[in-house]
Amino acid sequence: MVEQLGDRAIRFARPASSARAIVRAVRAWPGVTDVVVARDTVAAYFAGAPEVDDAHIAALAALPDDPTPPREHVLRAIYDGDDLDELARTTGVDVARVHAAATYTVDQMGFLPGFAYLVGLDPRLAVPRRATPRARLAAGSIAIAAGYTAVYPLDSPGGWHLIGRVVDARMFGPEGSLLSIGDRVRFTC
């Protein structure tokens, strides 16, 4: 089902195809200026009135994976976050070691410019959001919550558990976002 978002955008349920393939296909639609992939939905923004029908949406469900290899990022991390010790007690694991052992994929972008929701978090680190969000997290903070990990691209409020910080990388700036949907990310210490 396609939902109008004003006169220049639509939103529809996210098909099972890979996020990279969806973005590539939707960007090829006539008049598309931006595509936002969320966990359950996709929004497409247009220069004028959307010229999309149900056939466009249906075709997304059968997309092959994007053949272009994903970009790989290795982010240097210092695991010294405010919640690290508490999470180690709660989960019973060495949070830094387990977090750094995984390879993550950018599944969606949102919340803030350059905020990448990374999937691939070890299930032992799957914790809910904090009961009380913090008023300010520093740009570069590495955090986990609700089955995701992320690096805060800007100073902002946040309700995720802080486990460390990225050094030598700027997640968002005048040149845009360092990460894009489908990119792969590893953390090293």
What is each stretch, according to the model?
Residues M1-C189:
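Glycine-rich active-site loops that engage anionic ligands at enzyme catalytic sites
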